[in-house]
């Protein structure tokens, strides 16, 4: 039934609008609450046929732990996968992970959970539910998670090591994580948030009594704090009946503990919390201005969405100003962004804040410049032009959401339900959302926005958090000095913001259109159009996303056409162009001109190709093609923008090697490629060898002759509307075919790109680390034909290995948070395959774990893959194939690789998966070991 929103339009246009006017909630959700307090959300969604997502959310997190339980909320989340009443994993009944993977639901990708300060959420996603037994079992898992975890002594002890390794993974190489742990007691002094991060205390994790975990589970996992969410290709009434029958019998505990949401105190004087870490490369500052949150009971009204709308306008406009400042020849800060939302980790306090990277040689200047823009906005507000652009952008986003309202994947609707249950966010339809935005655009005045900016951006209730390098050469100003930087900047005098009037057209003078000289039907249902300048256009019309079109325009060439001596310039060829803007417009002006458009184009250059890639809405296809024309034929040269980017990069790279992970990655690349000049990292000293003239020349030569380019468009494209646009913006690109090519490469010679060295080696080195770790990478390379079958066999091999390592290295040994296995198959130079195995662990364990890694590979080469594991992988691949073929990105990938590499990854893919044998995978493992090309690189903490 078509809903009539005229009542809302009348109310919004009326001067007597009441902010408390209730919102109509999205009726497509079937919602309810059982007698025991459990909430449920159910929604049918046919976008993914035969697929559904199952979630259970808890209004429970690490903030509820008692001191002796620090880390147990997160620990309990892990234990949910290690045995329940109906999924024991003891041989009598399957465990949750094995059962899920038996139906194509992959652990990690589809089966997962997270714990935060105030919530814990579990998911079983992308479940094939055409069989009712599968749907019933997925609900049964949610039921068991809610109150039927086994929590056996043995499984608890096994998981301690896994948690410890997760702690190591999260902290190692992540200085901001460590510093955040240390500043929270200062920021939240006297509140429960002083020590509340979910990872907890490793001393407790390693030693807590079993009873403490069971007590936490019994106290907090209960139906009045839980919600079941099911979205997908299901019958909502049937699922509702099942939920009532299955979950209704769960008892609501008597004398249940109160779920307290702990307050955050306000402060008269600024709180300054600073911390230093030897692995932190740059100084980061976050200036918070705390505000009260909107009570949950006041969020289901028009006024709440209106306030959010105004707030988002303010943040958008302020960030645009900060980006302008960043484009200066010598930017006063490395980066700066404005935000509004939750204050750090607390649900009970909101904030506006500025985040900015400081120049270490001029910390005060960075503070001054960032705060100047927030103060300018607070005092003088925003211009009518700024406001109009921000409102246009809001409307464009709402229009796209409306256009694609029937194209949403399950997760979109799951997130709506999660936000409603966990944060009381209103659930409204895209139709109502669009109508609200239209009315807000008409009724919200500049004066209202500027008054809101004064309330949001304050000089009261402030908190300054600074993360800085711990280096002798960097002198961090004392806390009172940093506080004074803020106060002085907030008291300084500023002029109002002003901007020049924008031009009307991206391309003021259009060239004479070209023509389409031929049309035919191509592979995969594409329409192939030959243009008069020699460019070939492939169009794949789809209706998967009603308001999306993807584009790529590419040609052969790339950096392999240039000598090794140009290698320092390669990383800047594309970025120098985007930093400069395009045509007659600098980057800031271009951003403003595109504010009401959903269209963008980005240049890139790889070893063998140069490319322009973009996305647009259906209405803004013309704009995307205009940008394509400009980036190809009229890139903009801007020395000021280039020098500013190099200057920022130089500051970013000052302490580059402070992070051990950076040093490790540098060593990996050097070892693998023998210090090849094309594989050198960009360091501070490298910047001295970068030439803007040469960067510009490489770009112009790369995009000089469109006759050698192909274009691919995928999405909701109307061919008849497209033809004149192609004639105007693509057929007019410079081309040797019509003698308009703008340049010729200095050399047609193709320089060899580096391969991984042919070696069988083991490397070990040490590096000082703040979190003791061993990082291990093992690379196998071998010659392998580049075919769909070899790609599939290698994919299955890496997935089977991933499962084996999860079982043996993570679960049995508790030796790592996870072993990552990846592969690559290349056809250039010579057809080569690579398999990479990597993990992080305790330095005391790496010598025990590495042999296990090798044994698993040898086992598959000797005996073949585990048949159960291989069957699970094939089911997962077939399921994801069904999901992929209704996605524009999939078709872009498939068609591009057919055109560029001559490889058909689509035709008969399902049959290829079904026909792949254990022998095929075993042979791949044999080839891998038989090549004797293995490089192992381990970095240990000193």
Locate each region found by the language model.
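Proteolytic maturation boundary segments
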Residues: 20-42, 235-323, 327-329, 388-392, ...
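M16 family metallopeptidases and their MPP-like homologs
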Residues: 41-43, 48-65, 71-73, 91-144, ...
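Active-site His/Glu-centered metal-binding helix of metallohydrolases
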Residues: 72-80, 314, 573
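Metal-associated gating/positioning segment near the N- to mid-region
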Residues: 79-91
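Internal metal/ion-chelating core segments
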Residues: 204-243, 681, 689-729
């Amino acid at each position: 039934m078509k809903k009539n929103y005229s009542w809302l339009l009348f109310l919004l246009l009326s001067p007597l609008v009441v902010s408390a006017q209730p919102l109509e909630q999205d009726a497509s959700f079937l919602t309810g609450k059982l007698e025991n307090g459990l909430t449920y959300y159910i929604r049918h969604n046919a976008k993914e046929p035969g697929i559904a997502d199952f979630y259970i959310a808890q209004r429970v997190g690490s903030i509820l732990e008692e001191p002796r339980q620090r880390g147990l909320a997160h620990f309990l989340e892990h234990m949910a996968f290690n045995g329940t009443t109906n999924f024991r994993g003891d041989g009598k009944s399957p465990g949750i992970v094995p059962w899920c993977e038996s139906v194509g639901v992959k652990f990690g990708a589809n089966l997962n959970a997270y714990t935060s300060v105030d919530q814990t959420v579990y998911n079983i996603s992308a479940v094939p539910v055409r069989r009712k037994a599968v749907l019933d079992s997925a609900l049964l898992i949610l039921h068991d998670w809610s109150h039927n975890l086994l929590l056996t002594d043995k499984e608890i002890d096994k998981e301690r090591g896994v948690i410890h390794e997760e702690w190591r993974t999260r902290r190692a190489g992540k200085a901001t994580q460590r510093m955040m742990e240390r500043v929270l007691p200062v920021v939240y002094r006297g509140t429960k948030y002083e020590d509340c991060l979910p990872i907890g205390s490793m001393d407790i994790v390693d030693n807590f009594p079993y009873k403490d975990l069971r007590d936490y589970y019994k106290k907090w996992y209960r139906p009045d704090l839980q919600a079941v969410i099911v979205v997908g290709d299901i019958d909502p009434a049937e699922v509702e009946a099942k939920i009532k029958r299955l979950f209704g019998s769960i008892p609501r505990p008597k004398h249940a503990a109160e779920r307290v949401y702990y307050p955050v105190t306000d402060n008269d004087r600024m709180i300054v919390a600073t911390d230093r870490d030897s692995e932190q490369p740059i100084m980061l500052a976050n200036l918070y201005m705390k505000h009260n949150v909107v009570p949950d009971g006041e969020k289901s009204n028009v006024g709440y969405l209106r306030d959010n709308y105004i707030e988002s306008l303010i943040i958008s406009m302020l960030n645009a100003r900060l980006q302008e400042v960043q484009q200066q020849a010598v930017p006063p800060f490395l980066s700066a962004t404005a935000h509004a939302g939750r204050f750090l980790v607390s649900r009970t306090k909101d904030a506006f804040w500025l985040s900015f990277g400081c120049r270490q040689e001029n910390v005060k200047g960075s503070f001054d410049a960032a705060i100047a823009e927030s103060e300018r906005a607070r005092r003088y507000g925003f211009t009518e032009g700024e406001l109009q652009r921000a409102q246009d952008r809001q409307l464009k986003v709402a229009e796209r959401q409306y256009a694609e309202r029937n194209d949403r994947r399950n997760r979109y609707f799951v997130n709506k339900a999660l936000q409603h249950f966990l944060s009381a966010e209103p659930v409204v339809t895209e139709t109502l959302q669009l109508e609200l935005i239209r009315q807000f655009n008409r009724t919200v005045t500049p004066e209202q926005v500027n008054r809101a900016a004064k309330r949001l951006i304050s000089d009261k209730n402030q908190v300054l958090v600074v993360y800085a390098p711990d280096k002798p050469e960097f002198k961090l100003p004392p806390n009172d000095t940093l506080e004074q930087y803020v106060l002085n900047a907030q008291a300084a005098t500023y002029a109002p913001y002003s901007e020049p009037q924008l031009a009307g057209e991206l391309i003021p003078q259009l060239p004479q259109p070209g023509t389409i000289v031929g049309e035919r039907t191509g592979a995969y249902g594409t329409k192939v159009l030959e243009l008069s300048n020699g460019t070939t256009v492939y169009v794949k019309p789809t209706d998967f996303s009603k308001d999306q079109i993807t584009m790529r325009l590419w040609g052969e060439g790339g950096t392999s056409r240039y000598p090794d001596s140009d290698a320092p310039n390669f990383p800047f060829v594309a970025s120098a162009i985007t930093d400069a803007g395009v045509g007659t417009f600098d980057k800031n002006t271009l951003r403003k001109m595109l504010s009401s458009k959903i269209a963008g184009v980005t240049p890139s250059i790889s070893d063998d190709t140069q490319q322009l890639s973009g996305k647009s809405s259906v209405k803004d296809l013309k704009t995307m093609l205009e940008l394509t024309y400009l980036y190809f034929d009229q890139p903009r040269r801007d020395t000021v923008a280039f020098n500013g980017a190099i200057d920022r990069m130089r500051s970013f790279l000052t302490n580059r090697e402070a992070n051990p992970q950076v040093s490790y990655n540098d060593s990996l690349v050097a070892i693998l490629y023998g210090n090849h000049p094309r594989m050198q990292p960009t360091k501070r000293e490298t910047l001295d060898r970068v030439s803007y003239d040469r960067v510009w020349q490489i770009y112009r030569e790369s995009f000089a002759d469109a006759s050698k380019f192909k274009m691919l468009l995928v999405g909701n494209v109307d061919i008849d509307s497209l033809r004149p646009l192609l004639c105007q913006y693509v057929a007019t690109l410079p081309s040797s075919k019509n003698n308009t090519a703008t340049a010729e490469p200095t050399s047609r010679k193709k320089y060899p790109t580096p391969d991984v060295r042919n070696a069988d080696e083991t490397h070990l080195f040490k590096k000082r680390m703040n979190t003791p770790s061993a990082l291990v990478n093992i690379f196998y390379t071998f010659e392998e034909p580049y075919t769909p079958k070899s790609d599939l066999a290698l994919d299955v091999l890496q997935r089977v290995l991933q499962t084996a390592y999860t079982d043996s290295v993570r679960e049995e040994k508790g030796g790592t948070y996870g072993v990552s296995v990846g592969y690559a198959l290349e056809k250039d130079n010579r057809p080569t395959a690579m398999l990479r195995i990597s993990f992080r662990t305790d330095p005391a364990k790496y010598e025990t774990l590495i042999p296990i890694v090798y044994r698993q590979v040898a086992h598959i080469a000797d005996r073949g893959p585990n048949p159960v594991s291989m069957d699970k992988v094939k089911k997962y691949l077939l399921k994801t194939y069904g999901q992929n073929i209704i996605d524009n990105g999939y078709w872009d990938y498939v068609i591009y690789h057919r055109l560029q590499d001559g490889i058909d990854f689509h035709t008969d893919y399902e049959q290829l998966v079904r026909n792949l044998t254990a022998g095929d995978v075993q042979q791949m493992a044999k080839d891998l070991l038989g090549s004797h090309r293995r490089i192992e690189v381990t970095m240990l903490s000193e």
